[in-house]
């Protein structure tokens, strides 16, 4: 990519050292990459400075309540109507959309996979998305899909926007550069980023490894927001100041480019003669952001018992039923375990919610073996799950002194809807055939006599 064609708010080429961000969650931001490009006192002047075009990008209906009303005003080199021409059909057969009831022979059950294989061919991020599960219905804007991605090639002249939902990207191996209409974000493992529905972007490699891998939650429903803290109060969990939105940056490039679109589960492509990432200035609250998971401030039991995992929610996308999420993004970060007379790992559970889990690095305390970084587990609604036999015996017999659970970061996409497995996931070579055996060592201890066994 020609770095000299990219200009940031400092008028410099966009390098890792020059990228800047604006702190806050849901703020009404303003930023310009050329002085005076942002109109003051109005949104739509008769003529914009620098010959720019004013355009509004709406993330909510005009009449949504003020607290959930989202829109941004963009001041760009060309209006978006010039960024699409006649569309033709495109195909990304491994990226599926709900409802998706693929036919496969894998029966219902608790499932776990090792990391998806590195590609033998050259793949961009867009070409490297592999859907594992789908839930709900994208056309009616409910539910989500869980994907893995693996790629090794930059999206140089290829751009993409997703009309079906917002994308929460969780890198696991390799940092990525996410160049959106509204600015540039460098995102490394242990960070996440969110790209709003309908926003144009491309993704580039960062670093020197041979493969880049991670996870994606495609949220079809109401957008992700911060969960209510309730009696926790005004602090802890994910604090708003730790979310970072990029400053304005634009790519001024007059070369053949392709714009790819996902709309109602189908893919289309159109060819244009310039970069669509041409927003010189913008203001508003509909914007991408990134977040460092290491800044999450966990709370937990400081005397006894194991609290519900909802205390580890970073973001939640609500449904129409209060307290029932369309999808939650939950992490299991480093933390101190201090509970007395308590089985400290997550307890055995059957749940109305369906849980897709991934591991960014380290070990997960309920599954010290078999669940590896880059791996995936799926525990669908009402299917039992919990610590394996090794973790149970260890936690049941260990000395209960304060212990720091360190060097770990697991996460969960949890939804109220059943997660339907794709044919790709059902037939993936990394599926662990012996996963259920992890509980085989949990033998009967009950013999009818009182006392600790």
From Swiss-Prot:
One of its GO terms (biological process) is tyrosine catabolic process. Pfam families: HgmA_C, HgmA_N. Homogentisate binds at residues 364, 385. It catalyses: homogentisate + O2 = 4-maleylacetoacetate + H(+). Its cofactor is Fe cation. Its EC number is 1.13.11.5. The active site is at residue 306. InterPro entries: HgmA_C (IPR046451), HgmA_N (IPR046452), Homogentis_dOase (IPR005708), Homogentis_dOase_bac (IPR022950), RmlC-like_jellyroll (IPR014710), RmlC_Cupin_sf (IPR011051). NCBIfam families: hmgA. Belongs to the homogentisate dioxygenase family. This is Homogentisate 1,2-dioxygenase. The lineage of its organism: Bacteria, Pseudomonadati, Pseudomonadota, Alphaproteobacteria, Hyphomicrobiales.
């Amino acid at each position: 990519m020609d770095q000299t064609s990219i200009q940031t708010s400092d008028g410099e080429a966009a390098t890792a050292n020059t990228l800047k961000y604006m702190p806050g969650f849901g703020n009404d931001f303003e930023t310009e990459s050329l002085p005076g490009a942002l109109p003051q006192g109005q949104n739509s002047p008769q003529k914009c400075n620098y010959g720019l075009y004013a355009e509004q990008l709406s993330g909510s209906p005009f009449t949504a309540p003020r607290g959930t009303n989202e829109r941004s005003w963009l001041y760009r080199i060309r209006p978006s109507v010039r960024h699409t021409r006649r569309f033709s059909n495109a195909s990304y057969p491994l990226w599926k959309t709900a409802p998706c009831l693929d036919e496969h022979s894998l029966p219902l059950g608790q499932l776990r996979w090792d990391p998806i294989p590195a590609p033998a061919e050259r793949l961009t991020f867009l070409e490297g998305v592999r859907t594992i599960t789908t839930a709900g219905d994208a056309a009616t804007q409910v539910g989500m899909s869980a994907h893995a991605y693996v790629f090794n090639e930059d999206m140089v002249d290829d751009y993409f926007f997703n009309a079906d939902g917002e994308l929460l990207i969780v890198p696991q191996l390799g940092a990525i550069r996410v160049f959106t209409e509204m600015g540039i974000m460098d995102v490394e493992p242990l960070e996440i980023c969110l790209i709003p529905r309908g926003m144009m972007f491309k993704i580039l490699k960062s670093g020197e490894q041979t493969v880049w891998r991670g996870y994606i939650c495609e949220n079809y429903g109401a957008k992700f927001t911060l969960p209510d803290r309730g009696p926790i109060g005004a602090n802890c969990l994910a604090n708003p100041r730790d979310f970072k939105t990029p400053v304005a940056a634009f790519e001024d490039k007059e070369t053949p480019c392709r714009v790819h679109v996902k709309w109602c589960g189908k893919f289309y492509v159109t060819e244009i003669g310039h970069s669509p990432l041409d927003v010189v200035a913008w203001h508003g609250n509909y914007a991408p952001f990134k977040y460092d998971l290491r800044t999450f401030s966990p709370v937990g039991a400081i005397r006894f018992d194991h609290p519900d995992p909802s205390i580890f929610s970073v973001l939640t996308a609500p449904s129409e039923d209060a307290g029932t999420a369309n999808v939650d993004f939950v992490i299991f970060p480093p933390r101190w375990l201090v509970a007395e007379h308590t089985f400290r790992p997550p307890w055995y559970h059957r749940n109305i919610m369906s849980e897709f889990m991934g591991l960014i690095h380290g070990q997960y305390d309920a599954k010290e073996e078999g669940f590896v970084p880059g791996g995936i587990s799926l525990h669908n609604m009402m299917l039992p799950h919990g610590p394996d036999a090794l973790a149970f015996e260890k936690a049941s017999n260990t000395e209960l002194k304060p212990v720091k659970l360190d060097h770990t970061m697991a996460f969960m996409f949890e939804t109220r809807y059943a997660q339907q497995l794709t044919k790709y996931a059902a037939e993936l070579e990394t599926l662990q055939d012996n996963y259920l055996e992890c509980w085989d060592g949990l033998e009967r201890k009950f013999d009818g006599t009182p006392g600790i066994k």
